[in-house]
């Protein structure tokens, strides 16, 4: 259990890409990493928030990753 003596926690973070228009500045592509690096508020019980909408069968999607659709 994370937080118990001798335990380790691993966090894998995959950020969505962002395209810059006209010019790329040092602040582009950092929105997700800035949010992930901010501390959680005191009393936060669950540091992970799942805000993804699950796949629905039969709904067309924009398929960007060249791999088979999960079944």
From Swiss-Prot:
<keyword id="KW-0964">Secreted</keyword>
<keyword id="KW-0479">Metal-binding</keyword>
<dbReference type="InterPro" id="IPR040234">
    <property type="entry name" value="QC/QCL"/>
</dbReference>
<keyword id="KW-0808">Transferase</keyword>
<keyword id="KW-0862">Zinc</keyword>
<comment type="similarity">
    <text>Belongs to the glutaminyl-peptide cyclotransferase family.</text>
</comment>
<feature type="binding site">
    <location>
        <position position="19"/>
    </location>
    <ligand>
        <name>Zn(2+)</name>
    </ligand>
</feature>
<dbReference type="GO" id="GO:0008270">
    <property type="term" value="F:zinc ion binding"/>
</dbReference>
<comment type="function">
    <text>Responsible for the biosynthesis of pyroglutamyl peptides. Has a bias against acidic and tryptophan residues adjacent to the N-terminal glutaminyl residue and a lack of importance of chain length after the second residue. Also catalyzes N-terminal pyroglutamate formation.</text>
</comment>
<feature type="active site" description="Proton acceptor">
    <location>
        <position position="18"/>
    </location>
</feature>
<dbReference type="GO" id="GO:0017186">
    <property type="term" value="P:peptidyl-pyroglutamic acid biosynthetic process, using glutaminyl-peptide cyclotransferase"/>
</dbReference>
<protein>
    <recommendedName>
        <fullName>Glutaminyl-peptide cyclotransferase</fullName>
        <ecNumber>2.3.2.5</ecNumber>
    </recommendedName>
</protein>
<dbReference type="GO" id="GO:0016603">
    <property type="term" value="F:glutaminyl-peptide cyclotransferase activity"/>
</dbReference>
<keyword id="KW-0012">Acyltransferase</keyword>
<dbReference type="GO" id="GO:0005576">
    <property type="term" value="C:extracellular region"/>
</dbReference>
